UniProtKB/Swiss-Prot annotation:
It catalyses: a lipid A disaccharide + ATP = a lipid IVA + ADP + H(+). The gene is lpxK. Keywords: ATP-binding, Kinase, Lipid A biosynthesis, Lipid biosynthesis, Lipid metabolism, Nucleotide-binding, Transferase. Its EC number is 2.7.1.130. This is Tetraacyldisaccharide 4'-kinase. One of its GO terms (cellular component) is plasma membrane. Pathway: Glycolipid biosynthesis; lipid IV(A) biosynthesis; lipid IV(A) from (3R)-3-hydroxytetradecanoyl-[acyl-carrier-protein] and UDP-N-acetyl-alpha-D-glucosamine: step 6/6.
Amino acid sequence: MLERLWYAKSGWRWLLAPFALLFAIISGTRRYAYRHGWRKGYRSSLPVIVVGNISVGGNGKTPVVVWLVEQLQARGYRPGVVSRGYGGKAPHYPYRLDAASTTAQAGDEPVLIARRCGCPVVVAPKRADAVRLLEQSGEVDIIITDDGLQHYALARDIELVVVDGARRFGNACLLPMGPLREPVTRLKRVDAIICNGGEPGRGEYPMRLVADVPRRVRDEAPLAAPLSGPVDALAGIGHPPRFFATLEGLGYQLDQRVAYGDHHPFDRDELVGRFAGKPLLMTEKDAVKCRSFALDNWWYLPVSAELPASLLDTLLHKLGAGGKGQGATQAQG
């Protein structure tokens, strides 16, 4: 309901204006307090890169985090990732993921990143606690925080913001009147803006998601031969239509298209009963939640972010200069 108001012209949104004003006052005051030192955030001894957004919903942050980890690893860095672990309930916090960690414990994005990148990943409601654990481990020399642009209690050195190039900022209003967590003017203070699909704006870095060969959810086996005939598709992500459009662009004939909310806790009986016939395609993020009960004809589509070399050059330059990008000066966290 709200999402339809955010991304379409609707006079009904003005009914939410008082709540948006209240949100603006509270969030703006908090941001101002950290920026001017009235509230102190935790500053790590290691460089911290935040990958986030100013709007709610799926903008493509996780592929950017994976890309960043892989690029830094290839250049000799030892990155670690911290996350809030949304949707999970760990046995304790901070919680470092291991090979047996589940999405019920750590959330879906952290499990995906840990399995895909093989780097240390720690979750905690207070990201500073996760950062301290990584510092104490001595295993990392740079920290990437998955989401957390608005988590000003953790100081950062570089800020990357991912924008949905197709939907942009909707009606450009703050929550709940619109989809924005912070005003569009916040982008003036970040180090880089990444445009996921669509036409990038001035100064934005274009990003493209490149699909790989589908893999079986149950055991990661690559698809040996193209799937023929109709297939079903499910997506429990921030913007499911983007995934369905990707599948159609790859030539798949979709029968059922089932969209769930982001971080949806899948029920085995429901999915097995609903998708027991035709082959099923899902996102990698959904696959990490379904692996334990997946059927043999369930597949996920791995995607990787493709970004210009100039973005990496910019980041490496900032790190070489001590990791003090614009983001380090705009807020204590």
